[in-house]
Amino acid sequence: MAQRHLPALLIIMDGCGLAPADGENAVAAAKTPFLDSLYEKYPHTTLGASGEDVGLPDGQMGNSEVGHLNIGAGRIVFQELSRINNAIKDGSIAKNEVFVKAMDDVKAEGKTLHLMGLMSPGGVHSHMNHVEALVKMAAEHGVKTVRVHAFMDGRDVDPQSGAGYMSEFCAFLAKISEETGCDARVATVSGRYWAMDRDNRWERIQRAYDVMVNASDADVDPVAGIKAYYEKDPRGDEFVEPFAAHNEGIHEGDAAIFFNFRPDRARQMTRVFTDKEFDGFERKQIKLSHFVTMTEYDPTFDVEVAFPKTFPENVLADVIAANGLKQLHTAETEKYAHVTFFLNGGIEEPKEGEERVLVASPKVATYDLQPEMSAPEVTEKLVAAINEGRADFYIVNFANCDMVGHTGVFDAAVKAVEAVDDALSKVVPAILAKGGFALITADHGNADHMFDVASDGSKHPFTAHTTNRVPFIIVDEKAKLTGIEDGRLSDIAPTMLTMAGIEPSAEMTGRVLATEA
């Protein structure tokens, strides 16, 4: 067995990515004397924290949930969108038991399969590739009638792009119908403003629901209907008023698949279809043979889920506990779930020997008003715990760069970065004084890009995450990089365990980026 090297400290500077100092980068603009000294003295590299490096589609920004899940798992954890894309790519979607059962039953009973969701290539709530794959699967499965209830986007894509991709989709349906004999058509069209409300404005949902479930004599070309709405309201697709294109209605014994993979704007419509106690408005209640959701929208919903949540096993916290060691996880409120639930592989219950320290986030309207947030209090409690020797592994999240970055206020974001630097100047010496080592990283970028610059030179606040790589600093006198250039977040846990003299779990496919010289 390798010699133990403890205590170990993992510092996650939430939202602190790496980018050139271009005047839009609060991380580069901040005065960070302590971090600068670490870069000069200790081995360091960068890690991928977005796209395929964290189980997301290529080019998609990371986030705190995904970042912490990958950090703790020590392997790439594929997210729902990537899992669905992979199932389509390798053909395994055709064997998905939930889809197959729904299609078997409507085929046997001569009923209709209804597909509803956001008709968009945006990839934020849904993807057109997914509904096309479902139509094709149903046709090949022998389903005779497929009706699509299309919710138009206009937010995650250009406001008036819907007519173009609806035209392509209708051509796809016509081709499928001709080749297979399956009668596949667009039944209804609704802007997401109506069909995907998430603020309990039930009158909006009702407008879309009533059009979907009630039969209509209308025979409207979906593309023509959308274009007609553009002339009425140039705001475009998001606000397209619900209309029937070719709709016989939704009837008892039919089956429905909601193909959105993101839950938040799919929950209300799902409730109307499935909640027997629903009282948001007077509705025509229909007993469907199946109501399938692409992913889990809410664990309390009475639905079938095609791609249920999966969580990794034998993560960092499990390995620490299995070795009889103590661990302490700490953060302020805004990131407490990330450094506990998500870091621990989606498990709420603390591990054996795990202590959790929650510090309340400040009660301010927006965090640019207090950019240091609760970093001083988190720091004070963590340093005290280290000095008392309360754990073998310490894991801390500093929320500042992310939460203040989201406000879009550049000067405040600079102060947030400086507050994190000040915190590090206290916690890192504390762990070194105990003969331990520290790993410093981030879960994704944010404060590293605070403005978009328009063609006329004007600046507009950029409040989203970035796809930039994140830092990885190994604060240890004896550490030596292994030379891997394309590190990613999933390499952190194997590296930390190896440096501590502990064998990573067999499930950890991440690589070791540094060892003891």
Residue ranges and their predicted role:
Residues 1-517:
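Feature captures the catalytic ectodomains and active-site-proximal regions of enzymes
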